[in-house]
Amino acid sequence: MMFKKCLSVLFTCLIFISSARAQLVIEITSGADQLLPIAVVPFGYEGVDALPEDIAQIVEADLARSGLFQPIPRSNMLSMPSKEADVFYRDWRLLKSDYVVIGAIKKLPNNQYRIGFELLNVLSQKPVQKHSSIDVSARNFRDAAHYISDKVYELLTGTRGAFSTRILYVTAEGDKKAPLFKLQVADADGHRPQVVVESKEPILSPSWSMDGRKIAYVMFRNRRPNIFIQELATGKRQQIAQFRGLNGAPAWSPDGKKLALVLSKDNNPEIYTLDIATQKLERMTNHYAIDTEPSWEPDGKGIVFTSDRGGNPQIYRLDVNSKRVERVTFEGDLNTRARMTPDGRYLVTVQKNDGNYHIALQDMKTGRVQILTETYLDESPSIAPNGSMVMYATTYQGKGILAVVSVDGLVKYRLPSADGDVREPSWSPYFK
């Protein structure tokens, strides 16, 4: 039931989005020190027509991308069972696999398929996940595979998987002097990219609503920045900020009722909140310095933002009720683009040290700071809804790409694009 509900949200959110050809391609660059060996056996199928997707291959790629698992190559498998009764656990012990994912696919009427799967513990020779099945259409095979990946990941790590989530990002294609900007949405693995909106002027700061049904972003018109809200299911777009001067950096509140944004209509960039239903605007900061890049705390009680009120740009926290402001970051030459993990434990920033911009993680309890990346010109971090990974924009071989790093800094991979530069990533919430 949960899978069908999430699938419905995903499908309806994408009805009015046009197709895009060039997808992001994952290149894993490092993983955890001790990987968990797991075999994802090709799912059994007795039909005569070709399947839309290789379910097992997608699950295997998802688990490998997490940096926590070491999939057993298919070419090494001694057998390929599709149900537990056919499993010879000795085969998998010889391959030193700790777990095995098996499954079978059955064709149903009306172009539907039933996908069954199990997760088996090789050592105990017992199921971790007993046989479970989901019914999907041909177009939803990738969704089914990501769902299975999420289940396996959660069962073996205790953390909810984020393979079924999506990402927003902006590409700049064509002539570098006059590029075409495209706001695109894709699966978290870069597959199935689709264009949400395109423009000959810049598109910036895409942000998801907490139910995943709407997005906010900045799009320039006649060289002036304007803020829009757009429904993914209908394509309906609403311009919600077109004040004189700067209109920028929209960020949804956790309850989805407000946007934090940056306006300079009163002659200086300040943080405001906008009640989406009533259009009531409230000024939250009042300082001669530049206040920008707001991001809500998970409980909605505070907003972290960038300000140069202390000299160089650093991160400050604004109490939403009292409007009291306090400084949060003290290490590094500067810190910008703050994002907080869903549990509120860590703050992710872009930190500059000795001329280098890297993604940094600050423990909000201890104050300890860890530099997570070694890439070049890192910017725009966005955190997965389970708090395990940070996606960010960087430069690789002279081209703007997206990259991902785990919050412990051990797992890293790139998502290069075949077309143009890629910037401004935004990781979706879980679809409810």
Swiss-Prot record:
Coiled coil: none annotated. GO terms for biological process: cell division; protein import. This is Tol-Pal system protein TolB. Residues 1-22 form the signal peptide. InterPro entries: 6-blade_b-propeller_TolB-like, PD40, Tol-Pal_TolB, TolB_N. SUPFAM superfamilies: TolB, N-terminal domain (SSF52964), Tricorn protease N-terminal domain (SSF69304). Belongs to the TolB family. Part of the Tol-Pal system, which plays a role in outer membrane invagination during cell division and is important for maintaining outer membrane integrity. GO terms for cellular component: periplasmic space. The keyword Cell division applies. Keywords: Cell cycle, Cell division, Periplasm, Signal. It comes from Marinomonas sp. (strain MWYL1). It is found in: Periplasm.
